[in-house]
Amino acid sequence: AGLIGAGGHGGAGGAGGNQTGGVGNGGAGGNGGAGGAGGQLYGNGGDGGNGGAGGANIAGGNGSDGGAAGHGGAGGSARLIGAGGHGGDGGAGGNTAGRRADAIAGTGGDGGNGGNGGLLSGNAGAGGHGGAGGSSTATTTTGTPPTGATGGNGGNGGAGGTAGFTGSGGIGGNGGAGGTGGNAGVALSVGSTGGLGGNGGSGGLGGGGSLFGNGGAGGVGATGGNGGSGIGPASVGGNGGKGGVGAAGGLAGQIGNGGSGGSGGAGGNGGTGDTAGNGGNGGAGAVGGNAQLIGNGGNGGGGGNGGTGATPGTGGAGAAGGTGGTLFGAPGTTGADGT
């Protein structure tokens, strides 16, 4: 924008094409465009565009992957007075019908960062959320022994923007969930193994305040994907993916409360089989943001629970709360550990 007016929103990224014949990967999704800046005197920043989804592998050629998703665009910043734009969300990773251990579903796109608030006044924009990882959509029946495809990792959340002279910091985006691993085996196959679940994405950092304003909350870590099932005698389920890590809360302004820390995501469950797969570990929580002069510290995030399985996953550690203001304010509480 020029002197007065809002910045334009960024365009969305296009979806990747599907792969429908023979061996090959789904196409990658396009990235979202960045939002425009607000006017020199007054105006909000534009929102970033969302990332495009990754294309799927549909035909199921051996070793074929799902396409990676596009990332969200950054939110535009305000200049003097106005709010920052929100970051765009990441696209979802493409699924795969590939029937081999080296087939991998597409990774989810990362969320874009939020724009900053105006120098004089304005709240900062929130970070975009990470996209979910793709999943396996077919059962592997060949190989010695058959092994399922791997689920895609979730994308990470974008960071919240920083506030201006007065205003709150932006909230961090949440991570995207991990995709599910593929099933493997037939009734008479021996020793088949389910595919691994994808890891959950991490949350984005909370943005800071300036003079008057709260820090933004940190983003939440996402759940890990479940492992695929093993089929037949002596089969083993796939291991669950790890939960994503929470992100730290933002620092408060001189007067204001610190942002709460994001919680960790739960680990994915191990797949079924004659022997179940192991559960994924839960993600750790993140520390709360500190207050500065007057205000309370943000609460710390709790750890995610471990997934179920032959060996259950370990719960993530909870994190400490932020410190209270030096003149007045209480510290934040400590987040609970995951089980």
Language-model segments: which ranges?
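Collagen triple-helix signature
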Residues: A1-G338
